[in-house]
UniProtKB/Swiss-Prot annotation:
It comes from Mus musculus (Mouse). Predominantly in testes (germ cells and Sertoli cells). Lower levels in ovary (oocytes and granulosa cells), thymus and lung. The gene is Nek1. One of its GO terms (biological process) is spermatogenesis. Its main location: nucleus. It catalyses: L-seryl-[protein] + ATP = O-phospho-L-seryl-[protein] + ADP + H(+); L-threonyl-[protein] + ATP = O-phospho-L-threonyl-[protein] + ADP + H(+). This is Serine/threonine-protein kinase Nek1. Keywords: ATP-binding, Cell cycle, Cell division, Cilium biogenesis/degradation, Cytoplasm, Cytoskeleton, Kinase, Magnesium, Metal-binding, Mitosis, Nucleotide-binding, Nucleus, Phosphoprotein, Serine/threonine-protein kinase, Transferase, Tyrosine-protein kinase. The active site is at D128 (proton acceptor). It is found in: Nucleus; Cytoplasm, Cytoskeleton, Microtubule organizing center, Centrosome. Gene3D superfamilies: Phosphorylase Kinase, domain 1, Transferase(Phosphotransferase) domain 1. Residues 329-357, 643-662, 674-708, 814-866, 888-925, 1021-1045, 1063-1120 are annotated as: Disordered.
């Protein structure tokens, strides 16, 4: 670098950096391209040096000249000439939509073809033809640059950056990961020509995936008809999907409208060197056309070829200018025009004999003249036929080209351009017997041949032309008209068929999309079924885990049985205590009632409310807060119809003394009617303040109290002023079961169910089983706070009694109100409706319902806290009985309705660890009330809780485990709908099928070779599976549902058979060449201790290059079909190597990132390499090219691809 002075950086591309420098020796400007080869091995560096040496020896006016190359600081520097005119890409952008002239396009294209021919003739591939690599000099000469560099950089990451930066020039075989060949350069050449004609890329798409699909389909917008048919036809040939159908660069240069421009850009000596390099016999006889003054084209430049080919030594006749006169030219011209090369020597012999015989005798001359006339006549007939055939062939090619431009691939018939090519190959020189002269020489002299034909008709053939040619002309004209009409009809029918095919193709696309969606949906359903089946079965292959699971199941069953037995024992004990306390309370009430009746009889003149207040227990509270009549309360909950019956049964059990006092009570009621009316009004006003919508019914009840009393008298029952007395006095038998709040009924709600007439049912139990409206749940907790703490001391003895039953967990926070306060706390009101609602569909424990309640509970400030005090003087006894009654209700529901094993199932992820540690907390009395921390911990949405409650397994254990034997949880409905609407059933799960139609053999290789344990695979892919199976991020982990399960028996047998097949028949998967490459790569890996690059990226051996060569006639160098058949094997093998070298997680991350960028229409694909290199790091940066090829090939084979 000391010989050059850096001026500025002018670009960066596949090669690395390009720097403009100035030479200190000659002062000229050069471009130095810096290539980083530090990552290459020594062998690859040697190969790179040889390649650069070959490139430096190429000298051609249309190729950027290499001056020298050297290495410094781990980089390869290539010095080449500087083109001041910029590149063709900038020139196209400078047009700003104005199309180029066809002559300008063809001039540039011919120069590009000449440069590419120079490269291809030396069996070197360019591999990076694009408008940015085609440069313009000051005088407008086109020079091709950067050729061969992609071959040098075959194993570096820069090649991958090239593919990302300029994906518009990729050929279908590259997208399909097939070997690169010379026809891939032809495809890129067609892309450049299309860009010159339209100023746009032939294949454009919003993302890489769609671009690859467009390239594979081979459909491109048609070129403007402003350009000639020859140019459009050439373009369609360059864009053939099959590489063997594309012409070679030599065939392109043989076309007439291309060949006539060669002379403008190459000197005669260069033309001779370039075109004689391949076949010397082609251009040996070509000085003949050079003498014609009318041609003015480059064919006359073949005269200097005498010095190189030495035609005198070959043909025995010196080729000089004076040897060929105008007369001989006239004789030699028509045969090549008539395509009768084999008759040229015969004509020549006939003319020599004619001259000899004319000098000898006139008779012989006349006979020869007659023979010559006959031959000329036949030649003319053949010429006319040839013209007609050529016209028909041209029309046919034009129709094919139109169909090709419209994108219909099925219209083409076999051998599209073979006939034309063959006809031109049949042309040879006048002296040479070779049938391989260039097509361009014949077509260029059509005008000269016609002029000579006219001169011959006027001078030498006037006699026989008038007789014979005149006789054939009318018939010939009629034939032409008929052929033209037939061609027009055929063209119309052809266009009609094309329209029908277009319509049928559109219908076929719709059918295909429907079938593809069905296939994807079927695959998705099958995977879900297999996943559910695998998750639900025991793991046969893993004996230890199976045994542990069985032991855990047995332990859970035993634990549940013991819990159930304990629950039943507790329920029995509590029932016995409840019965005993009920009897004691009943006896106490009986005695109190008798004393009360005696006192009322003795002091009948004393007002009844005062007597009741003296015996009521809590006068101060009754003075402050109004008394709620039990009639009004029971009517509100729908018990007004059954109240009388219940009262009858309770009164019959109370005492026979009650019936004997009925008359006395009736007289007392009549005497105290005025006082009762006054008192009733006060109670009525108090009730209206609390429950506003009951005013009218209360008022009617109080006004019609006398008639109501009569109704009770007619029934033969005890008549008691229930509306005027307190709750404990009027209904002492049921005071043990009364809940301490007013039940407010929604006026618009559905009517309540009628309770059965069972004398053993308590009010508390009925209220607990009743289906309450929302108003009963919306009580304000703060309104009861003082009452709860005020009464807390009254229940301490009861808690002491229950401690021997171990019904209170030590770990529960004492600040939370325990079960003894539930008799007047609104939390019990929350439990009851939830419990009844939960039992409608599926029985569950009370703890689950309490945890779900706060998400739907709202406070209602409309209910004042003055309704709490309905306690009687027998407060402690009533509270004890109510507590026991509630416990009995809960325990009976647990025993009767709950499924064994449902203990703590739905809330196992939400429970406090302290509660889980208690062996009996699962069935505790306090299960209906959780500590405050548990209520704060509930952050899940209601839908998620419902899904968890529905899909919880009965065998689920209490502690949280990472592995679960429960059936799988169904995916969220929303995520399923999204998957159905988008069709992406298998896009995000790496364990699913990668494409719709191809098996993922990488999993098979991974199973046979990597053999990771099931647990390891699960831990590695846990995060990915969680993202798929659990759409709600705040929800609990679904890791137990995504355990990588062992396959069932059928899948194991399939894997075993495929493993045996792979071991016994390795030759079936790869061809011999591929096997040798794999073996050699394995040897290199063993020697170096690292994974060598894939064989397609290793330029060190010729057999390992992912290249092949296609000639014009593919018979001579036909590539083995095994290479195409094993494309899938290449892909899966490449996938396997990448997973082994990088690790599955990193490989999958990079793969998905590249795929996402390719599919994102808004993403700039040029930044893909930077992002991916940051993920890969320096260690795996060289693998980017392989990952890119894999992504592109997967996208190519994923959709419909016929070839």
């Amino acid at each position: 670098m000391e010989k050059y002075v850096r001026l500025q950086k002018i670009g960066e591309g596949s090669f690395g950096k390009a720097v403009l420098v100035k030479s200190t020796e000659d002062g000229r400007h050069y471009v130095i391209k810096e290539i980083n080869i530090s990552r290459m091995s020594d062998k690859e560096r040697q190969e790179s040096r040889r390649e650069v040496a070959v490139l430096a020896n190429m000298k051609h006016p249309n190729i950027v000249q290499y001056k020298e190359s050297f290495e410094e600081n781990g980089s390869l520097y290539i010095v080449m000439d500087y083109c001041e005119g910029g590149d063709l890409f900038k020139r196209i952008n400078a047009q700003k939509g104005a199309l180029f002239q066809e002559d300008q396009i063809l001039d540039w294209f011919v120069q590009i073809c000449l440069a590419l021919k120079h490269v291809h003739d030396r069996k070197i591939l360019h591999r990076d033809i694009k408008s940015q690599n085609i440069f313009l000099t000051k005088d407008g000469t086109v020079q091709l640059g950067d050729f061969g560099i992609a071959r040098v950089l075959n194993s570096t990451v820069e090649l991958a950056r090239t593919c990302i930066g300029t994906p518009y020039y990729l050929s279908p075989e590259i997208c399909e990961n097939k070997p690169y060949n010379n026809k891939s350069d032809i495809w890129a050449l067609g892309c450049v020509l299309y860009e010159l004609c339209t100023l746009k890329h032939a294949f454009e798409a919003g993302n890489m995936k769609n671009l690859v699909l467009k390239i594979i389909s081979g459909s491109f917008p048609p070129v403007s008809p402003h350009y000639s048919y020859d140019l459009r036809s050439l373009l369609s040939q360059l864009f053939k999907r099959n590489p063997r159908d594309r012409p070679s660069v030599n065939s392109i240069l043989e076309k007439g409208f291309i060949a006539k421009r060669i002379e403008k850009f190459l000197s005669p000596q260069l033309i001779a060197e370039e075109f004689c390099l391949k076949t010397l016999s082609k251009f040996g006889p070509q000085p003949l056309p050079g003498k014609r003054p009318a041609s003015g084209q480059g064919v006359s430049s073949f005269v200097p070829a005498q010095k190189i080919t030495k035609p005198a030594a070959k043909y025995g006749v010196p080729l000089t200018y004076k040897k060929y006169g105008d007369k001989k030219l006239l004789e030699k011209k028509p045969p090549p025009k008539h395509k009768q090369a084999h008759q040229i020597p015969v004509k020549k012999m006939n003319s020599g004999e004619e001259r000899k015989k004319m000098s000898e005798e006139a008779a012989k001359k006349r006979r020869l003249e007659f023979i010559e006339k006959e031959k000329k006549q036949k030649d003319q007939i053949r010429f006319l036929k040839a013209e007609q055939m050529k016209r028909q062939e041209k029309q046919r090619l034009e129709r094919i080209n139109r169909a090709r431009e419209q994108g219909w691939r099925n219209v083409l018939r076999a051998g599209g351009s073979g006939e034309v090519k063959a006809s031109f190959f049949g042309i040879g020189g006048a002296v040479s017997p070779s049938p391989c002269s260039p097509r361009g020489q014949y077509e260029h002299y059509h005008a000269i041949f016609d002029q000579m034909q006219r001169l011959r008709a006027e001078d030498n053939e006037a006699r026989w032309k008038g007789g014979i040619y005149g006789r054939w002309l009318p018939e010939r004209q009629k034939g032409h008209l008929a052929v033209e009409r037939a061609n027009q009809v055929e063209e119309f029918l052809q266009r009609k068929r094309e329209a029908m095919q277009n319509k049928a193709r559109a219908e076929g696309h719709v059918v295909y999309l429907a079938r593809l969606r069905q296939i994807r949906l079927q695959n998705f359903n099958e995977r879900q079924q297999i996943k559910a089946k695998l998750r639900g079965e025991n793991k046969e292959a893993d004996g230890t885990k199976g045994q542990e699971a069985t032991e855990e199941t047995d332990m859970r069953l035993k634990k549940m049985e013991s819990l159930k037995a304990q629950t039943n024992a507790r329920a029995a004990v509590l029932k016995e205590q409840l019965e005993r306390k009920r009897k004691e309370a009943y006896e106490r009430e009986k005695k109190v009632w008798e004393e009360h009746l005696v006192a009322r009889v003795k002091s009948s003149d004393v007002p009844l409310p005062l007597e009741l207040l003296e015996t009521g227990g809590s006068p101060s509270k009754q003075q402050v807060k109004p008394v709620i009549s039990v009639t009004s309360a029971l009517k509100e909950v729908g018990l007004d119809g059954s109240l009388t019956d219940t009262q009858e049964e309770e009164m019959e059990k109370s005492n026979s003394a009650i019936s004997s006092k009925r008359e006395i009570l009736r007289r007392l009621n009549e005497n105290l009617k005025a006082q009762e009316d006054e008192k009733e009004k006060q109670h009525h006003s108090g009730s209206c303040e609390t429950v506003g919508h009951k005013d009218e019914r209360e008022y009617e009840t109080e006004n019609a109290i006398s008639s109501d009393r009569k109704k009770w008298e007619m029934g033969g029952q005890l008549v008691i002023p229930l509306d005027a007395v307190t709750l404990d006095t009027s209904f002492s038998a049921t005071e043990k079961h009364t809940v301490g709040e007013v039940i407010k009924l929604d006026s618009n709600g559905s009517p309540r169910k009628v309770w059965g007439k069972n004398p053993t049912d308590s009010v508390l139990k009925i209220l607990g089983e009743a289906e309450l409206q929302l108003q009963t749940e919306l009580l304000e907790n703060t309104s009861f706070k003082s009452e709860v703490y005020a009464e807390e001391e009254n229940y301490k003895p009861l808690l002491t009694e229950e401690e021997n039953l171990q019904c209170i967990s030590k770990e529960i926070n004492p600040s939370a109100t325990v079960d003894s306060t539930e008799t007047k706390s609104p939390k019990f009101t929350e439990v009851s409706p939830q419990m009844s609602e939960g039992n409608v569909e599926e029985p569950d424990d009370l703890e689950t319902e309490v945890l779900q309640e706060p998400s739907s509970t709202h406070t209602d400030g409309s209910l004042p806290p003055v309704l709490n005090d309905v306690w009687t003087r027998e407060k402690e006894a009533a509270k004890e009985t109510e507590l026991e009654d509630k416990v009995a209700v809960q325990q009976s529901e647990v025993c009767e309705d709950r499924i064994p094993g449902n203990v703590d199932q739905s809330c196992k992820d939400q429970r406090d660890p302290a509660v889980d540690d208690s062996p009996q907390s699962g069935c505790d009395v306090e299960k209906s009330v959780q500590p405050e921390s548990i209520f704060q911990k509930v952050v899940h949405s209601k839908d998620l809780n419902l899904v968890q409650a529905v899909h919880c397994s009965p065998e689920e254990p209490i502690p949280i485990r990472s592995h679960s034997d429960s059936p799988p949880k169904t995916k969220s409905k929303n995520s399923l709908l999204i998957g159905l609407s988008t069709g992406l059933f298998d896009a995000n799960n790496p364990k699913m099928l990668r494409t719709c139609s191809l098996p993922d053999l990488s999993k098979l290789f991974r199973t046979l070779m990597d053999v990771p344990t099931v647990g390891d695979v699960h831990q590695d892919s846990l995060e990915i599976d969680e993202l798929e199976d659990e759409p709600i991020k705040e929800g609990p982990s679904d890791s137990e549902d995504t355990v990588f399960e062992e396959t069932d028996t059928d899948l194991q047998e399939l894997q075993a058979s495929m493993e045996q097949l792979l071991r016994e028949q390795p030759g079936d998967e790869y061809s011999e060449e591929e096997e040798s490459v794999l073996k050699s790569s394995d040897v290199e890996q063993t020697a170096r201790g690292t994974d060598a690059p894939d064989e397609e990226d290793n330029p060190s051996s010729e057999s390992a290059l992912n290249e092949e060569w296609h000639s014009d006639n593919s018979d001579a160098e036909t590539t083995s079909e095994c290479e195409y058949d094993s494309v899938f094997n290449h892909l899966e093998e490449l996938r396997l190597h990448l997973e082994q070298e990088m690790g599955f997680e990193k490989f999958f991350e990079v793969y998905e990132k590249v795929k996402a960028i390719h599919e994102d229409e808004d993403e700039n694909i040029e930044i893909c390499s930077t992002i991916v290199e940051n993920i890969l790091g320096n260690e795996h940066q060289h693998l980017y090219a392989k990952i890119l090829h894999l992504v592109m090939a997967d996208g190519a084979y994923q959709e419909d691809n016929d070839e």
